């Protein structure tokens, strides 16, 4: 599988790398890690993301190369590689339209709900992170990892394992992290930048969640809803709403946590997390056209906040009542 992709890449001079909108650490780390590695292999590389690079990951060397998706496909582009993106729709509207008929799309991912879009697939379901998949890919190709590539892949693995707290953290994952440290990752510096420098606006958003979250089902279900206009009232931005579900998830006794966010475009965004392996939020999300992992999934649903919320909560309540 890895060898086939290597052969295809060797035939290309110019490659694009992109990932899902509202990128997390794994999306950015995977895009940058692969992009920089391909450059080291002598390729011309474009790196794109519809929403750009979140501020917390801007310290990564080369992050400025990840730019908005262009209006037109570059004339010299021969291959598009999509990383950490389980569904074509998650790439964003502009990317979908621009590359709808592109002849060579590679799908590298770790989501169990991957829809297998594209022409070439390297999909390892429920692996710790896409960055971990890429670590193994690059290692199999004999690529020498620079500090910049190692930093990017480490951020991807660390953030998608909850800083190595989740069940996906296997001995193999820890061994990979050790190899990345040996390649130059400064763990203290990376952890400080990613986890210990939170903007004041993000703390305001966390306070909002703590003040207004709802706990039900005998403490097993916790959720918070952000109505239209609330971000503007609080003076917070899009990036401040990232990872809010973790504020709810850590409450003692909670097995499922959900954040509902009115996107003000007729759609509701939902982030679902499970702390119980017997409750798959991926299965719940799939009922509403969403997907992801068993312990972490998302949904985007058209409709009113109250209606969408109740439909999803009822599905979760039903699942919890079966226990």
Question: Can you say where each PLM-predicted feature lies in the sequence?
Answer:
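Hydrophobic/aromatic beta-strand patches that form the interior of the parallel beta-sheet core
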Residues: 48, 81, 104-108, 120-123, ...
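Hydrophobic helix-and-loop "lid/oligomerization" segment in the mid-to-C-terminal part
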Residues: 2-18, 29-58, 74-77, 159-323
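Short alpha-helices
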Residues: 108-176
């Amino acid at each position: 599988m890895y060898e086939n992709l290597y052969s295809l890449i060797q035939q290309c001079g110019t490659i694009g790398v992109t990932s899902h909108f509202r990128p997390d650490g794994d999306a950015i780390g995977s895009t940058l890690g692969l992009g920089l590695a391909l450059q080291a292999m002598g390729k011309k590389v474009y790196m794109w993301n519809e929403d750009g690079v979140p501020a917390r990951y801007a310290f990564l060397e080369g992050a400025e190369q990840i730019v908005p998706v262009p209006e037109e496909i570059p004339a010299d582009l021969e291959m598009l590689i999509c990383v950490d993106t389980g569904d074509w729709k998650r790439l964003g509207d502009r990317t979908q339209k621009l590359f709808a008929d592109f002849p060579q799309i590679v799908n590298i991912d770790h989501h169990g709900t991957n829809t297998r879009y594209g022409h070439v697939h390297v999909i390892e379901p429920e692996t710790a992170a896409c960055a971990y998949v890429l670590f193994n890919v690059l290692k199999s190709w004999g690529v020498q990892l620079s500090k910049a590539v190692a930093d990017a892949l480490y951020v991807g693995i660390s953030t998608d394992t909850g800083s190595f707290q989740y069940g996906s953290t296997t001995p193999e994952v820890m061994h990979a992290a050790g190899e990345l440290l040996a390649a130059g990752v400064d763990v203290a510096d990376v952890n400080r930048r990613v986890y210990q420098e939170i903007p004041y606006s993000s703390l305001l958003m966390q306070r909002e969640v703590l003040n207004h979250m709802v706990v039900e089902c005998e403490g097993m279900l916790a959720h918070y809803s952000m109505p239209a206009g609330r971000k503007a009232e609080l003076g917070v931005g899009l990036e401040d709403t990232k990872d809010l579900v973790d504020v709810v998830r850590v409450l003692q006794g909670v097995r499922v946590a959900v954040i509902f966010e009115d996107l003000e475009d007729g759609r509701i965004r939902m982030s679902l997390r499970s702390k119980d392996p017997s409750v798959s939020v991926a299965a719940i999300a799939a009922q509403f056209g969403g997907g992801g992992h068993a312990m972490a999934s998302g949904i985007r649903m058209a409709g009113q906040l109250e209606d969408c919320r109740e439909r999803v909560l009822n599905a979760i309540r039903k699942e919890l009542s079966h226990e």
